[in-house]
Amino acid sequence: MPKTIHLCWFGGGDYPVEVKACLDTWRRILPDYKIRVWTGDDARALGIPYVNEALDCRKWAFACDVVRFYAVYTEGGVYMDSDIFLYSRFDDIAATDADFITFHEKCDPDHEDFGLQAAMFMGVKGNRFCREMLDHYAKEHFLNEDGSMNLLISPMRMRDVASRHGYVAEDREMRLDILTVLPTRRLKPRKRYPRSKDCIGEHRVVGSWRKRPLGRRITKRIEHLWRAVRYAICHK
């Protein structure tokens, strides 16, 4: 598996401080990996209707849902959302004898209906799971016939594709024919999820594309300013 981290960054603009903090962990913990940035122009060049429709609506995350599978399918390596904060290397996972590896995404202990982790996964070039995901999206449109948006998220789509190969929503390691799924504890899906000894990182779910209520936006803005000050102090 190549030591490449694929990152999608659409819409231009600088990385927010929360993303910079996450990328710093990648560079510090994985100095031997190169970061491959996929832009909106790269995404549009694929000529996939679902992607183009999502880009036209400025729904970057949904366009990225497809590009991430294309990146790993065509080049191999590791895909990570920009808000993955690493705690440690994952050499043991990358060395697993599997063509595609991801994690369960059980955000709360009482969740029974959960999907697969789309914020971070890895695979070899030409792996079958990414191929099947691309085939799935090739039949989809982001815009429905009535003009509404198709907002089914990729963790659920991944689960549906994996279910054809024996996947069931049980938070344990599963080695299936075209993918391996690791327990949620190996990658925290949310801040509130407890950190285990073998946890490699956390999905911080910055979600800068989301529309939030005014009160929540104010709270997030204050948190952002505090992180910006702390980041500036730490990087003097």
Kindly give the residue locations of the regions a language model identified.
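Glycosyltransferase-associated regions of secretory-pathway enzymes
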Residues: 1-64, 80-236
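Small-residue hinge/turn detector
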Residues: 65-77
